[in-house]
Structure formats: C-alpha cells, structure tokens
Amino acid sequence: MIREDEVRKLVGEMREPFLQRPLGELDAVKEIKIKPEKRHISVKVALAKTGTAEQMQIQQEIVNVLKGAGAETVGLRFEELPEETVAKFRAPSAEKKTLLNMDNPPVFLAVASGKGGVGKSTVSVNLAISLARLGKKVGLIDADIYGFSVPDMMGITVRPTIEGEKLLPVERFGVKVMSMGFFVEENAPVVWRGPMLGKMLNNFFHEVEWGEVDYIVLDLPPGTGDVALDVHTMLPSCKEIIVSTPHPTAAFVAARAGSMAIKTDHEVVGVIENMAYYESAKTGEREYVFGKGGGDKLAEELNVPLLGRIPLKQPDWDKDQFAPSVYDENHPIGEIYQDIAKKIDAKMSVQV
C-alpha cells in the first residue's frame, strides 16, 4: 500500500487551479489518512476557492492519481487557503472579462419547460448547433445541474482543460459546451442544495474562458426552481424559449415557466412544440401521439409566436461522429431546427 509521504508527493505535485502553483509549494496538502486494510486514502486539500468547477476537476484528478497508485477508494475534503497565501501567490491582473461584463455581451437564450420529459435538452442542443451552422459563435451551458445530459447527447467524451485561471469549454459541432456532467465521475448523482447550484452556475459565467460568443444557450432544469430563479436574477436581459409537447397538460404546466419569465421581465421569444406528431415513412400519414394543439394554445396564452413543430423521428447516427441526439442539417428535423434558428437570429438582429 502506498505510504503517506508518497501520497503527499503525488498530490503535492498537482497544480492549484487558481494560483497555478504546486499544491505542495502552497502547503495545501493538509491531512492524509491511510487505511491499508481497506485500501482507502483520505486527503484534505486547501484551494484558493472552493465550491467551484475547478474544485470538481482537481477532485477528479486527485482521485484518478491515487487510484492509479493503488487505492481502491479515495475520500477528499476541501478548505480554503489563508488569504495571505492567496495574496502572496496571485499575480496582479486587470479585471477579468467574463460573460457578464464583456464589451459586446452575447444574447442569452434560456430554454425552459414546465415539466421534464418534453425533450427540452434535445431542443437546446440542436438549437445551439443550428445557430452555429448559421455562422454564429455559440456557447451552450447545461444548467440542469441535477439532470445533466448535454455531453452524452452530443457524444462528448473529453473534459474541459484549464488555462491560467480559467476553464476552457469543450467544443463540438462548432459549439462551446460546459456542463456539470464534466465534473462528476461517470453517471454519479449530484446531491446538492439550492445555494450550491447557484454557485456552480455562477462559475460557468465567471470562471470559464468563453472567448467571443454571439449566443449562449442555457438548458434550464424543468420547472421554476432554484436554478431558474438564479438565472432570472443573474441575467436580467435573458431571453426565453418555452418547450412543450402538444399534450394539453404539458402545455398547461409549461405556461408556468412562461409566466415566471414574464413576471421577471424576461422576454419570451416563442414556443417550440416538440414531439408534435409521428409521420409514417411508408405512407406519410401523421399520427398525433400526444394530442394536438398544445403548442398553439400555449403560444396564444403567452402572446408569442409558435417557432416550430418538431416531429418524433430519430437522428441518422454516424458511427464515426456518434452523437445520439444531434440531427444532421440535411435531416428533415435538422431542417426544422435550422428554420427555427433563422427565426430567432432574425428577431435578435432586429432588436440589436
């Protein structure tokens, strides 16, 4: 079993994500406990900031290093470095440019729904990609912290990297992507309370190097909970798109998300009716599996346009570039998304 001095050396050689100095140089490896009979290692580490995406990333890196050295299980605790240590090692710099203080800020488009299971994340992914296909610079934030799915939908298998004090988003299909899914091990659940959710979302805005972007699409959690409230507070100029199925109940519940946007002075750009119908490949006959008219009724209630109806149909999967929820631009549904993206971009261009 690995010894304590070996653990200290391995962890101490890793770089603190904010100060970019070895943890050992910062005296940041605080406690080490080893249980040889259980092959368990417990480490307490100090960082310049805790509760951040960077903490999640270095946590995963430490776990991987120690498991590679022979541990079966790893326990990690974090605390913040003393202010004097942070001040000593942090280089002076000008105000950091973030998504919220750019000279030319992007258009924020939040994709919301009243309930889960209506295909909101699929819409978010394909809308972001369709905007990128129009030549726009697009970022996509998977803000569904508990139910993150964007990396899997887009077939992303790599994780963000760190450059300086910022995370670099993963880019695929011309879209820069950031998700909680990058910072948890495999399909592990996120067991957090509301304040931690808002903190992580804030990190996606402030601690990620997005570069120049025209649009940031946010895939919100369903409903009107903590994350949706945080978005309304952090992004007062955010636009919203409401996703519903044609089913009357889904449309009724989706109206709550729309009403919340209106009450907080967020413009609702329009409604997208997902799973609108199933069209037979043989006969062309349409079956309205989830009913009919829910999207129209919702759009009328919110006094916004129905941006499009998206039928039930699988994407054409490419084994070389596997992305289970992405529609090719020449796919019939890909063409519908492209049309929706054009409508949204035209409206945003007029407003600018």
UniProtKB/Swiss-Prot annotation:
One of its GO terms (molecular function) is ATP-dependent FeS chaperone activity. Signal peptide: none annotated. Keywords: ATP-binding, Hydrolase, Iron, Iron-sulfur, Metal-binding, Nucleotide-binding. Induction: Autoregulated. SUPFAM superfamilies: P-loop containing nucleoside triphosphate hydrolases. CDD domains: Mrp_NBP35. ATP binds at residues 114-121. GO terms for biological process: iron-sulfur cluster assembly; negative regulation of DNA-templated transcription. It comes from the Bacteria. Belongs to the Mrp/NBP35 ATP-binding proteins family. Homodimer. Interacts with BrxC. Binds and transfers iron-sulfur (Fe-S) clusters to target apoproteins. Can hydrolyze ATP. Negatively regulates the expression of hpr/scoC. The effect on hpr/scoC may be indirect. This is Iron-sulfur cluster carrier protein. It comes from Bacillus subtilis (strain 168).
